[in-house]
Amino acid sequence: MVTTHHLCLLRSTVLSVPVRLRAPRAPPHPRLPTASASASSYHGPTHLRRLRPLRAAAAAAGGASPDGADGAKRPAPAAASSSLGAALVGFARSNFLPLALIAGIALALMDPTLGCLAHKYSLSKYSTFGIFLISGLTLRTKELGAALEAWPAGLFGLASILLFTPFLAQFIMQIKFFPHEFITGLAMFCCMPTTLSSGVTLTQLVGGNTALALAMTAISNLLGIMIVPLSLAKYIGVGAGVSLPTEKLFKSLVTTLLIPIILGKVARETSKGIAGFVDGNKQGFSVTSAILLSLVPWIQVSRSRSLLLSVQPKAFAVAVTVGVLLHFALLAFNAAALHILSRLEQRGVSVFARNEYARAVILVASQKTLPVLVAVVEQLGGALGESGLLVIPCVAAHINQIIIDSIIVNWWRQRDQQFANAK
């Protein structure tokens, strides 16, 4: 008789019976453990492997390593996201002005409706008035008086800001470029006084003489009300073939710039409460000033959006490059002039050679302000071209000069730290 089912083939059927129906097995005979058996019994069983994640979680919660020893704490995802958020907030605070300017331009390019409506109600004039009102509120007389010690360096800085650097405008006007407003705007930028806040802030960061920086900033902007119209008429009007209304421009700058500065300064000096409030909320006033300044390019770009979109990216890149080269030229000129002046003075240590004075002059005298340029463009009413095209390259130049000078300040600080460590 042929056997069709071998007995070994029936084992799988028996093993497939549910667990509940199986007969209980007798415990195996005890065996002596071997080395391999011990290792497999430690690493092999499933219930021990399942316990390891629980041990690791308990160790992380208690600040210990999974092996039981105290180790370095691993940063939790919530802590990592919190530190990233703090870093982003810190970056936004330290770079609020460039970010606000970029945001204003981007908003105008996406939807110009609100910007055109703001122009209809002359919002840019009120924003400019507010900027210089804040400048007057934050201006300290005591700090201005402290700069008298370095008056030769301050005098050179003022001459560089108001006389020497505007001279470059006539060479920039010789560049043949389309649209011509880009080059005209950069030439006008050369004729402006120094920045209202960034030069002083960077001087303070690098350990320069803040009082000297403040003095040059305040005096150059006040004198600029009288000198800027003359510089524009001489270097820009002749090159552009137009006659600028110098007297009208001077009166408008007095109304838009000088009067709000005087009002702010008088309010600060006559009321200790106002002065204390302003000094205690410097960050808030700085943010407010940046927001007011960002409204201007937002309005100008909204008006000129169709023209800006017709400009080739290559042309804009060339204008940005010219602005960067212009700032490098101003830095090189001021640094070289200070070096020469320090060699000419033989008695003791020259004020031109002292780092705290030299750095203040280099930073402040090499920067140009955007609000005064905007006020000038607003008052000219298109005499030199489309307002938006005049302002756009200057906004880029303003942002680039802050970035470049921030890099220089960081390099100076690192070098000072190396010298201090070497001592």
From Swiss-Prot:
GO terms for cellular component: chloroplast envelope; membrane. It is found in: Membrane; Plastid, Chloroplast envelope. Belongs to the bile acid:sodium symporter (BASS) (TC 2.A.28) family. Keywords: Chloroplast, Membrane, Plastid, Transit peptide, Transmembrane, Transmembrane helix, Transport. This is Probable sodium/metabolite cotransporter BASS4, chloroplastic. May function as sodium-coupled metabolite transporter across the chloroplast envelope. The keyword rRNA processing does not apply. It is a multi-pass membrane protein. It holds the Pfam family SBF_like. Gene3D superfamilies: 1.20.1530.20. The keyword Chloroplast applies. Its main location: membrane. The chain crosses the membrane at residues 96-116, 123-140, 153-173, 182-202, 212-232, 244-264, 284-301, 315-335, 389-409. Residues 23-45 are annotated as: Disordered. Residues 1-55 form a transit peptide. The gene is BASS4.
